[in-house]
């Protein structure tokens, strides 16, 4: 079994990772780590996430010098569920020792240092690893994931958007010059576990944010190979993303061509479900699935994608990448 370490295990995505690793037949949960100065250090994991009382009672260890030494000498792989700038600093240390790293932050998703200064607010000093990282969109980049030491797990909105749009783009069905319009809503857990006024119980609402400046817009455009118009919303529920996407098709594109594009793209991909009816958050919350459906009228197409932002949009996609990297069946430990 592979000794698996999670850094950033106190957060929502880190907690989902811990549960998935615990249940994976080929992985051993070797350590749950938080920053050395974290107020959660030495607490039991289950005290923060009580659904795991009796099943995951391991302590959250501080990532101090002793912790780093233990990881570098005994771990087989590292999962980072840390802040973007923290991942940018930590990942090269693990990579230099030959450890495979699966990073859930945005630190290595786009091969452009200026992107990080503009959208993430920090200077990226790891150009080497930016160039070598594989973008872990599991259904689309399996060969790159197999070959890479560093896998940048996609963001939640990009996962939903790209799974919906890439079949159309690959098949050349989108009208030339058209920017797909992505209207997406995410549950409050997408904002993370840290307390904030706008995500507190009495303040949370359904509202748009990040208009024209959300960091996931350039990530989507970069990996789609086409500019998009992206408007995210904060939803008044806990988990899940629903993305409704509007596309103008090239002249003469038929419903059969659209259907075939999706069927071809996701044949043999068990975690993408072509539902035949418009997806819902209820259908995917707590699951690793991506549900897709579409409807065409003339040359206009509406595509709807639903995922769990903490699973397919984070932890379970990381697990898919682990399965791909180490030659396990793609859905091992997930379904």
UniProtKB/Swiss-Prot annotation:
CDD domains: AGPR_1_C, AGPR_1_N. Pfam families: Semialdhyde_dh, Semialdhyde_dhC_1. Its EC number is 1.2.1.38. This is N-acetyl-gamma-glutamyl-phosphate reductase. The gene is argC. It is found in: Cytoplasm. One of its GO terms (biological process) is L-arginine biosynthetic process. Gene3D superfamilies: Dihydrodipicolinate Reductase, domain 2, NAD(P)-binding Rossmann-like Domain.
């Amino acid at each position: 079994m592979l000794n698996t370490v999670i850094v950033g295990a106190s957060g929502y995505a880190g907690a989902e990772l811990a549960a998935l690793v615990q249940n994976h037949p080929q992985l051993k949960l070797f350590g749950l780590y938080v920053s050395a100065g974290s107020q959660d250090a030495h607490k039991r994991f289950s005290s923060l996430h009580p659904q795991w009382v009796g099943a995951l009672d391991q302590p959250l260890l501080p990532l101090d010098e002793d912790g780093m030494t233990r990881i570098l000498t005994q771990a087989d792989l590292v999962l980072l569920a840390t802040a973007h700038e923290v991942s940018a600093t930590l990942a090269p240390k693990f990579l230099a020792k030959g450890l495979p790293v699966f990073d859930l932050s945005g630190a290595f998703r786009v091969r452009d240092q200026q992107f990080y200064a503009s959208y993430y607010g920090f200077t990226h000093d790891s150009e080497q690893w930016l160039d070598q990282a594989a973008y872990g969109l599991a259904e689309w980049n399996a060969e790159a994931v197999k070959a890479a030491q560093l896998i940048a797990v996609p963001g939640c909105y990009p996962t939903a958007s790209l799974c919906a749009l890439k079949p159309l783009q690959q098949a050349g069905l989108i009208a030339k010059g058209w920017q797909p319009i992505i209207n997406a809503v995410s549950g409050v857990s997408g904002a993370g576990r840290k307390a904030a006024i706008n995500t507190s119980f009495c303040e949370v609402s359904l509202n748009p944010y990040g208009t024209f400046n959300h960091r996931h817009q350039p990530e989507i455009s970069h990996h789609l190979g086409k500019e998009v118009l992206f408007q995210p919303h904060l939803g008044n529920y806990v988990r899940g993303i629903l993305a409704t996407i509007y596309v103008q098709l090239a002249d003469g594109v038929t419903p059969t061509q659209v259907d075939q594009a999706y069927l071809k793209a996701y044949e043999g991909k068990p975690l993408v479900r072509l539902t035949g009816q418009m997806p819902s958050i209820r259908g995917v919350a707590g699951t690793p699935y991506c549900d897709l459906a579409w409807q065409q009228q003339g040359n206009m197409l509406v595509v709807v994608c639903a995922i769990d932002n903490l699973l397919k949009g984070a932890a379970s996609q990381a697990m898919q990448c682990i399965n791909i990297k180490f030659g396990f069946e793609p859905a091992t430990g997930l379904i």
